[in-house]
Amino acid sequence: MLYPTPIAKLIDSYSKLPGIGIKTATRLAFYTIGMSDEDVNDFAKNLLAAKRELTYCSVCGNLTDEDPCSICTDPSRDKSMILVVEDSKDVSAMEKIQEYHGYYHVLHGLISPMNGVGPDDINLKTLITRLMDSDVSEVIVATNATADGEATSMYISRVLKPAGIKVTRLARGLAVGSDIEYADEVTLLRAIENRTEL
């Protein structure tokens, strides 16, 4: 069915979001049209504010509204550990369990030979720079249990082992192919407690 141009454009915009197909985009567009002007203005204002005010922490790469982020500036955290994750959503998932008290490093992607993504295409150089002259004795690799997650963890292990840094991987309480951000808190807690050395 053909929709008026403003609705068609809104549907197109929603459909560009990950996991949103045409049916859901259409539903969201019509829902948005039915919202009050005040709610639509608030929604638009919040979208723009998030886009303009958020940045990536210059230390760990986490999404933040202050640089460095509140995690990197927290002196009570364990300076001997860095937990490496794919993206900022994974930091939030780990923070929810309130059991990990070290620092983080966000890669903003994974090594993916099949997709032409190599180590230089993700945030790995800053991790290596951070580890020079630091008190870090263990790096916990918390990438998803996928082929790309495994490739990334093995690469990190190969690079860091010669420097004498212990490299561990989350235990396999996480199902192969699962995303960390969707795991429940107990599963994440068990995965951290039972991590394995690479």
From Swiss-Prot:
InterPro entries: DNA_Rcmb_RecR (IPR000093), Rcmb_RecR (IPR023627), Rcmb_RecR_Znf (IPR015967), TOPRIM_dom (IPR006171), TOPRIM_RecR (IPR034137)
Domain (Toprim): residue spans on this chain: 80-175
Gene3D superfamilies: 3.30.60.80, 3.40.1360.10, 6.10.250.240, RecR Domain 1
Stored SMART domains: TOPRIM
Superkingdom of this protein's organism: Bacteria
ZnF (C4-type) intervals: 57-72
Record keywords, A-Z: DNA damage, DNA recombination, DNA repair, Metal-binding, Zinc, Zinc-finger
Database matches in NCBIfam families: recR
HAMAP family in the cross-refs: RecR
Family under the similarity heading: Belongs to the RecR family.
Protein name per the record: Recombination protein RecR
Organism for this UniProt entry: Streptococcus uberis (strain ATCC BAA-854 / 0140J)
Taxonomic classification: Bacteria, Bacillati, Bacillota, Bacilli, Lactobacillales
